[in-house]
Amino acid sequence: MDSRFTYTDDDLVGITITRSGAAKYSESQPRDERGRFGSGGGDFTTSKLEAAYHAKAVYEKASHAEPAATRAMHELADKHGGKLVGLDYRLKSVESLTRKIADDAKKDFKSVAEAARNISDSVRYTMVSDPKEYAAQARAVTEDLRSRGFDVTVKNYWQEGSNYKGVNVALVDHSGQKIELQFHTAESFAMKESTNHPIYEEYRKLDDTSTPHGQELNAQMVANSASISTPPGLTGFGVPKIGKSLDNKLQVRYYREEGGL
């Protein structure tokens, strides 16, 4: 029996992707003036259909890797301390993957297939620790992950001027599955999920983040994040990072002005 994903996204209503990768359309799917399937009579959604096909493959691969990864995360939390939160969202949905793949392909000037290969958080976890134990627990967990055979890359966003605070760890398991693990304090997690979340969602949708509005949104996130107390003991841990850069959207604007898009 086919595994089917039917989309509720406005651009994909009425489209079902089967296990074979075929796209099936319902008669309710909007068409343009020439009878092509599209969004409200607009452009043909070929790129988004291709993104949906790749998203399904990414999701199925992630689904196979997730049980073992989740067991490992529970073992690490039990062994080293820290609390796993947000486990209901450990698998990114097909619809979310579709949007991310399509958006990344467009803004980074890469193929849809390449954008899909670069997805690093189809399986993702968050561990929350007490500030006094945060650094020691993050270091212990990452070293334990290395000893278990994971490829580990640590990005330390606890930097002055960052619009986001936390430690993000990019993992690759023995099968090649990419996994993300974020380390937060209760304070930084609340900032990410509540205070800064609506601002970031607005910011990331901007075509040009250098506009006064974009700069204002980023300044709000930086100011909010500056209020968070930095846990001790993080010096030298991971690669220092300042916020989640969206500067490539400036390249998109330039490319459009030159007639490339």
Locations of regions flagged by a protein language model:
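Low-complexity, glycine/serine/proline-rich disordered segments
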Residues: 1-54, 239, 252-261
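Charge-rich, low-complexity segments
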Residues: 43-119, 135, 139, 194, ...
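Long beta-strand-rich cores associated with HINT superfamily self-processing modules
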Residues: 110-259
